[in-house]
Amino acid sequence: MRNAFTLLFETIEERKNNPLPESYTNYLFSKGEDKILKKIGEECSEVIIASKNNDNEELVKEMVDVLYHCFVLLAEKNIPLKDIMEEVTERNGKLSRVGDRREIDTL
């Protein structure tokens, strides 16, 4: 049985491969990577605000928007969802120490 994430990603890929004129997903693909990245940034800001405001209902909605736009980016970059799922599986259960994390050198 496919889960909701798989179904969403399949729908996004279907829109990419078989565009529908009124599709928001196709609009994002037609505008390109910069637009997709801008939307991810906007949605992340909305997640922060919803969390800060302790609005869990809005937080859930905004998290779904972030995931959707990230999935669009994956499709744009031709990265299959299975690659993400494999990485999650690989990391699952592994202890991560703060000192083992890479520092952010540039912003």
UniProtKB/Swiss-Prot annotation:
Q: What is its EC number?
A: 3.6.1.31
Subcellular location(s) per record: Cytoplasm
* Top enzyme class: hydrolase
Which coarse location class describes where this protein primarily resides? Answer: cytoplasm
**Pathway, per record:** Amino-acid biosynthesis; L-histidine biosynthesis; L-histidine from 5-phospho-alpha-D-ribose 1-diphosphate: step 2/9
What Pfam families does its record include? PRA-PH
The answer to whether keyword Transferase applies is no
Q: Which InterPro entries match?
A: HisE, PRib-ATP_PPHydrolase-like
Which molecular function term from Gene Ontology is one that the record holds? ATP binding
Please tell me one Gene Ontology term that the record gives under cellular component.
cytoplasm
Alphabetized UniProt keyword annotations: Amino-acid biosynthesis, ATP-binding, Cytoplasm, Histidine biosynthesis, Hydrolase, Nucleotide-binding
GO BP annotations, alphabetical order = L-histidine biosynthetic process
Q: Which reaction does it catalyse?
A: 1-(5-phospho-beta-D-ribosyl)-ATP + H2O = 1-(5-phospho-beta-D-ribosyl)-5'-AMP + diphosphate + H(+)
Q: Which family does it belong to?
A: Belongs to the PRA-PH family.
NCBIfam families referenced in this protein's UniProt entry, alphabetically? histidine_hisI (TIGR03188)
Protein name (record): Phosphoribosyl-ATP pyrophosphatase
What species is given as this protein's source?
Bacillus thuringiensis subsp. konkukian (strain 97-27)
Which gene is this protein's source?
hisE
